[in-house]
């Protein structure tokens, strides 16, 4: 029984330490507990009314009230739901700017990395040499290709395959492994040579008889250009027709395309 009274006495002493019997504190606590009302910032007692008392500035009253100094480390600061400090500032502007930056960045990436066409244009015959034996006509031709890169990224030409036909028969073919780099929005010229052997009696007469004034043969050239672009390999097919003088050697100068630095 004595132990029970002693425990009750100690609890009363602790309550006295935590909540001192101060009429000013009673009004303060009542005011502090009413912060959930519609006007939370004006519920605390103003600072000038507590002059000389053991109070500190209330952390949730924007400096307009005080709490007991003894409970400064025990009370938890409560911020009302409608407090301006809980409202993020410039949220709409920040979200708008973030979305705009993402859209602009995505649009620029799509614009610059979107694959565009690679133009391959046969310029024509640059030179040819002719040789004959008893039944065959040998034509060594050199032609020019214009390659235009319309992309904003560089490309690399890796292979060129050429096939030459005369009267629907394959008379020459060649395949080259290349490593030709073409910059963004740039053009390059490349030369390729093909050795052709024509085994046709009428063509042989056209090329060797002196009585015939026109010594031209028609060659059909078809080719495949392989290039890589952004780690992706693609092929382009081109074709052209060339009239070749099979009586003598010819050389046709072509104006080279100027390349940007």
Curated annotation (Swiss-Prot):
GO terms for cellular component: plasma membrane. Pfam families: TMEM106, TMEM106_N. Keywords: Cell membrane, Immunity, Innate immunity, Membrane, Transmembrane, Transmembrane helix. It is a single-pass membrane protein. It is found in: Cell membrane. Its main location: membrane. One of its GO terms (biological process) is positive regulation of MAPK cascade. InterPro entries: TMEM106, TMEM106_C, TMEM106_N. The chain crosses the membrane at residues 95-115. The keyword Membrane applies. Belongs to the TMEM106 family. Activates macrophages and polarizes them into M1-like macrophages through the activation of the MAPK and NF-kappaB signaling pathway. Upon activation, up-regulates the expression of CD80, CD86, CD69 and MHC II on macrophages, and induces the release of pro-inflammatory cytokines such as TNF, IL1B, IL6, CCL2 and nitric oxide. May play a role in inhibition of proliferation and migration. This is Transmembrane protein 106A.
